[in-house]
């Protein structure tokens, strides 16, 4: 393995250990506590417009809460989820324990996964919800997700913005509090997505919500 590959693998292992340690107990109350400030998730999922019988992957699927919501809106979709935390996937599998449809959940690195790991050639939709702000090498996660799309597929992202339209004191307090949970909103998210869309001849839709509390984006890949 190259030096870069070794360093990346080491960083992934370290991040996995960090996430498992943080979520070993938090996962039991995660959905209850996060619903008050992880805004825009449900509307993003409703707008996924997954084709009938299409494939949907969530990168950083956590407890499976978003997957369950997506299943209610797109009952024929084939669901897949990856997370670097084994602890979170324990909760994800419990979320679907009594349901007829069970997604394929895998422990995987968001920066280095391929559709083949899930037995498919690509995904029609990929969702990254409040995960890029927790992935150290988040640009590579965007790269991997775009590469995993089917022709004409869509990558949907919702995450913390820069609160640019809100009072400075609110932004300062929020970002200091988020840092305690290893969350870092990405100030250059739009620029990175614009560059990626241009490179892949894809269309980018980007919007700010709630004074920049939430940034939401969709990259629509080129049809072959």
Feature locations, PLM:
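Conserved class I S-adenosyl-L-methionine
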Residues: 2-49, 65-69, 170-176
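C-terminal alpha-helical "lid/dimerization" subdomain adjacent to the S-adenosyl-L-methionine
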Residues: 10, 33, 156-215
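Short glycine-dipeptide loop
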Residues: 53, 149-154
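Class I SAM-dependent methyltransferase SAM/SAH-binding core
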Residues: 57, 63-113
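A short acidic, Gly/Pro-enriched loop at the edge of an enzyme's catalytic core
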Residues: 115-126
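A short SAM/SAH-binding and catalytic strip from SAM-dependent methyltransferases
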Residues: 124-137
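C-terminal lobe and adjacent flexible extensions of AdoMet/dcAdoMet transferase-like proteins
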Residues: 217-224
């Amino acid at each position: 393995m190259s030096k870069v590959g070794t360093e990346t693998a080491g960083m992934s292992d370290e991040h996995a250990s960090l996430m498992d340690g943080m979520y070993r107990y938090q996962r039991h109350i995660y959905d209850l506590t996060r619903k008050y400030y992880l805004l825009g998730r449900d509307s993003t999922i409703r707008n996924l417009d997954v084709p009938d019988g299409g494939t949907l992957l969530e990168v950083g699927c956590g407890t499976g809460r978003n997957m369950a919501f997506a299943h209610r809106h797109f009952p024929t979709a084939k669901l897949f989820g990856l997370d670097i935390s084994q602890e979170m996937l324990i909760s994800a599998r419990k979320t679907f324990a009594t349901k007829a449809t069970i997604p394929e959940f895998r422990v995987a690195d968001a920066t280095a996964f391929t559709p083949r790991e899930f037995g498919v050639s690509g995904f029609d939709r990929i969702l990254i919800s409040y995960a890029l702000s927790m992935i150290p090498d988040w640009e590579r996660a965007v790269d991997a997700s775009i590469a995993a799309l089917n022709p004409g597929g869509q990558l949907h992202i919702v995450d913390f913005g820069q609160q640019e339209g809100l009072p400075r004191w609110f932004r300062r307090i929020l970002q200091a509090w988020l840092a305690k949970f290893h969350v870092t909103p990405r100030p250059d998210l739009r620029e990175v997505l614009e560059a990626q869309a241009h490179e892949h001849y894809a269309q980018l839709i980007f919007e700010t919500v709630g004074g920049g509390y939430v940034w939401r984006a969709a990259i629509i890949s080129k049809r072959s």
